[in-house]
A protein has these predicted regions:
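Short alpha-helical segments that sit at the start of domains
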Residues: 1-18, 78-80
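Short acidic, hydrophobic short linear motifs in intrinsically disordered regions
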Residues: 16-30
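Short amphipathic alpha-helical interaction segments
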Residues: 33-49
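Charged interaction/catalytic cores of defense and host-pathogen modules
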Residues: 42-44, 55, 64
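A short, conserved structural fragment
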Residues: 48-58
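Minor-groove-contacting beta-hairpin "wing" of winged helix-turn-helix DNA-binding domains
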Residues: 60-67
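Short, amphipathic alpha-helical interaction segments positioned at domain boundaries
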Residues: 69-80
Length: 80
């Protein structure tokens, strides 16, 4: 559920490839009691392991974007 929220946010903002956003903006999609929790960190780690999300360090902060090479897999995952 948390992974789908993260992906839905990035899809709605059209954050693919070179376009990226700060990780804290992605965590704002979650209710306040889940922000920064172990579950949200594990969900983010799982998305990175599946290569759905690309992590980038920019301006000293972690930035994320969707992997454009995994577009079909991301849309299939969202349909499940």
């Amino acid at each position: 559920m948390i992974m789908k929220r993260f992906l839905r946010r990035l899809l709605n903002l059209n954050i693919w490839g070179g376009r990226h956003t700060e990780l804290k903006h992605l965590q704002q999609t979650l209710p306040s009691h889940l922000r920064g929790s172990r579950e949200s960190k594990e969900a983010l780690k799982e998305l990175v392991n599946k290569e759905f999300i690309i992590l980038k360090i920019s301006t000293g902060e972690k930035h994320v974007s969707l992997n454009s090479h995994k577009q079909k897999e991301i849309y299939d995952f969202m349909q499940e």
